[in-house]
Amino acid sequence: MVDWSTLPEELLHFIAARSFSLVEYKRFSSICVSWHSSVSGVKKNPFHRRPLIDFNPIAPSETLLEDHVFSCNPGAFLSRAAFFRVTLSSSPSKGWIIKSDMDTNSGRFHLLNPLSRFPLRISSESLDLLDFTVSEIQESYAVLKDAKGRLPNPGYQRSALVKVKEGDDHHHGILGIGRDGTINYWNGNVLNGFKQMGHHFSDIIVHKGVTYVLDSKGIVWCINSDLEMSRYETSLDENMTNGCRRYYMRFVDCCGELYVIKRLPKENSRKRKSTLFQFSRTAGFKVYKIDKELAKWVEVKTLGDNAFVMATDTCFSVLAHEYYGCLPNSIYFIEDLEPKVFQLDNGNGSSITRKSESSESSFEMFFPSFL
């Protein structure tokens, strides 16, 4: 067996420099003494000597959705949130999901509700990376009204980080779906309405380096680095999107393939005012993917061991057996601030379970006991 602690220091520097997140960098330094020494020192390692992630506790005056009081400070702010799989280092087969963004001034992590962007009240002040293994599994971006608030800018209810060509160079910018269904582009200074060809848009995703947007008619569009739109070769059939309104359809990447989730409302959506969090009650979901042989979108009857996590700012898939309490062939979502899970029809009919109605074991992966 290879003794990893004896790797050359030059190689360790090479590995550490390519850590894709701050958490991975900290995890690297906690593996063994020689690895920690290779990145120690003020110039090499700007972090604490003890490999901790420090959480930023929420003060009682902090703005939360349920408080119904929101800051109105001027200045839009780009927030990157990350989803992490956390396991006990001694038992890595199953884990939990936590979500955080970072305070730009202190460098401390804000823990967020995994299904929304609102803060969690926690009792723990830190997470010891000697006891836990933390791996980033998904990221999401939001243009917030201000740096302290948690409300997205109305023009960016769904957002994606994209590379945009400016002359001979490429720069990062944000494409977002507005509350009115329009597409907007933000480069950190300018909010611009995006000239578009489709109907009201519902979601946006960067999949395998290509930016896709989905409109309320089920038409999929591609946006290139010149911010030019073109219609994707395959769109959802009209009967798949009949009666669907914007925000009722979402993209999700599962095992490298692109899926569309359609939310089915219980009542006529026109009877209620639709906002980001207030829809008609959900009756269920339908899932679609592209059949490459038929060259069309087809309904997916089972997700197998996969579960979809449909957060307010992004959607992604996980393998159910890798997380505590996670139900396979299911979709986790939030409605009226309450976590819910929809189980696709497995022969016994489909069903929706609310966290308050269950033993909570089905939602255990979102609420780890160590926080």
UniProtKB/Swiss-Prot annotation:
F-box domain residues: 2-49
Superkingdom in the source lineage: Eukaryota
InterPro entries listed in its UniProt record: KIB1-4_b-propeller, SCF_F-box_domain
Disulfide bonds, paired cysteine numbers: none
Name used for this protein in its record: Probable F-box protein At1g65740
Organism for this UniProt entry: Arabidopsis thaliana (Mouse-ear cress)
